[in-house]
């Protein structure tokens, strides 16, 4: 018999059963899921990159010729 894994909600820290039946996992509720989405949309959360990484990544995207 296996025990149901429990994680903490990334937004509020409440314990959450991490099962397929929990449609909000790893969040405890739709509210916490939307709070997290809003934080990403307003750039409160960011994925760290080297300062010049974007310049190299997008350097070929813009053609200086008109």
Curated annotation (Swiss-Prot):
Binds 1 zinc ion. Its cofactor is Zn(2+). It comes from the Bacteria. SUPFAM superfamilies: Glucocorticoid receptor-like (DNA-binding domain) (SSF57716). Interacts with GyrB. Belongs to the DNA gyrase inhibitor YacG family. This is DNA gyrase inhibitor YacG. It comes from Pseudomonas fluorescens (strain Pf0-1). The gene is yacG.
